[in-house]
Amino acid sequence: MAARLYCQLDSSRNVLCLRPVGAESCGRPLSGPVGTLSSPSPSAVPTDHGAHLSLRGLPVCAFSSAGPCALRFTSARCMETTVNAHQILPKVLYKRTLGLPAMSTTDLEAYFKDCVFKDWEELGEEIRLKIFVLGGCRHKLVCAPFSCNFFTSA
């Protein structure tokens, strides 16, 4: 299961705001610290947190005060670039979902930092709204007991 999200950098508050694709524009954005790219521990994420928001398909960590599992976010545009031409990232995320050894956390952090922030910080793009894919998060099973294809819209 994966969820498609709008991702908007709010530089004034230094947060990354997330909202499900198709949500009303006046909906409450989800946010997490921009600088925190490590996954919160499962114990730091209460299982009932955010249940009242009814955003089906989003993992419980999306509502955590510690922020979402930022390591699981990547630009949908980057999914088929030369960086990921041989489908390494989906395999790595899937292995991590299963608890198998995969790419090191340091390498993943560097990859995601590049994907998420390169266009905004280095290329100076005016449009700061991107579509991102959330996949492989270990918290996803809390909100989505049903099975569906990896990297598809929720």
UniProtKB/Swiss-Prot annotation:
Annotated Gene Ontology cellular component terms: host cell mitochondrion; host cell nucleus
Domain of life: Viruses
Signal peptide (from-to): none
Iron-sulfur in keyword set: no
Keywords associated with the record: Activation of host NF-kappa-B by virus, Activator, Apoptosis, Host cytoplasm, Host G2/M cell cycle arrest by virus, Host mitochondrion, Host nucleus, Host-virus interaction, Modulation of host cell cycle by virus, Transcription, Transcription regulation
Processing after translation: A fraction may be phosphorylated in insect cells and HepG2 cells, a human hepatoblastoma cell line. Phosphorylated in vitro by host protein kinase C or mitogen-activated protein kinase. N-acetylated in insect cells.
Positions of the UniProt region annotated as Mitochondrial targeting sequence: 68-117
Cellular location(s): Host cytoplasm; Host nucleus; Host mitochondrion
Gene Ontology terms describing biological process: DNA-templated transcription; symbiont-mediated activation of host NF-kappaB cascade; symbiont-mediated arrest of host cell cycle during G2/M transition; viral genome replication
Subunit: May form homodimer. May interact with host CEBPA, CFLAR, CREB1, DDB1, E4F1, HBXIP, HSPD1/HSP60, NFKBIA, POLR2E and SMAD4. Interacts with host SMC5-SMC6 complex and induces its degradation. Interacts with host TRPC4AP; leading to prevent ubiquitination of TRPC4AP. Interacts with host PLSCR1; this interaction promotes ubiquitination and degradation of HBx and impairs HBx-mediated cell proliferation.
Functional summary from the UniProt entry: Multifunctional protein that plays a role in silencing host antiviral defenses and promoting viral transcription. Does not seem to be essential for HBV infection. May be directly involved in development of cirrhosis and liver cancer (hepatocellular carcinoma). Most of cytosolic activities involve modulation of cytosolic calcium. The effect on apoptosis is controversial depending on the cell types in which the studies have been conducted. May induce apoptosis by localizing in mitochondria and causing loss of mitochondrial membrane potential.
Family the entry assigns: Belongs to the orthohepadnavirus protein X family.
Protein name, UniProt field: Protein X
